[in-house]
Amino acid sequence: MAEFPSKVNTRTSSPAQGGGAVVSTLSPDLGFVRSSLGALMLLQLVLGLLVWALIADTPYHLYPSYGWVMFVAVFLWLVTIIFFVLYLFQLHMKLYMVPWPLVLMVFNVGATVLYITAFITCSASVELTSLKGSQPYNQRAAASFFSCLVMIAYGVSAFLSFQAWRGVGSNAATSQMAGGYA
């Protein structure tokens, strides 16, 4: 058996100037905003805001169907803001262990399905809940139209994120380094 050495050399050192803290500044990636993914996210944010603002301006709480539309619109709007900020400031690059193309594809497919149900619910409830030609009728009809548009925007995003996840048109090694957006 080896014995414990009788003499051990130790060395102490003082911390570096400034405490060793790393400070990095967040700077927006304007290339992301110009990309198809960034432009679609901005479109989803604007259209989603229109949907829930139009519904919120009516007495939607009296009708459960509009409660569902509000839930879908507000929830997906907030999650889209989170994804937009993550990609705009390249925070997704710091969380490299997360498969972002897959996460984005699953989110966009789920958002498309939820907006399909919200669009059907909203458009089917317009005539049942308000008088034709009244302000609530017009607002709910406009919300139905914009929910259809945002549903299409999420569908296009789902298709593009599926292609990014599969690696169509890019090398798998460079797609992670390029930020993962087209």
Swiss-Prot record:
Residues 7-16 have a biased composition (Polar residues). Signal peptide: none annotated. It is found in: Cell membrane; Myelin membrane; Apical cell membrane. Residues 32-166 form the MARVEL domain. Residues 1-35, 90-99, 163-182 are cytoplasmic. Residues 1-20 are annotated as: Disordered. One of its GO terms (cellular component) is myelin sheath. It comes from the Eukaryota. Keywords: Cell membrane, Membrane, Transmembrane, Transmembrane helix. InterPro entries: MAL, Marvel, MARVEL-CKLF_proteins. It is a multi-pass membrane protein. The chain crosses the membrane at residues 36-56, 69-89, 100-120, 142-162. Belongs to the MAL family. Main component of the myelin sheath that plays an important role in myelin membrane biogenesis and myelination. Plays an essential function in apical endocytosis. Regulates epithelial development through the regulation of apical endocytosis. Part of the intracellular machinery that mediates basolateral-to-apical transport of ICAM-1, an essential adhesion receptor in epithelial cells, from the subapical compartment in hepatic epithelial cells. This is Plasmolipin.
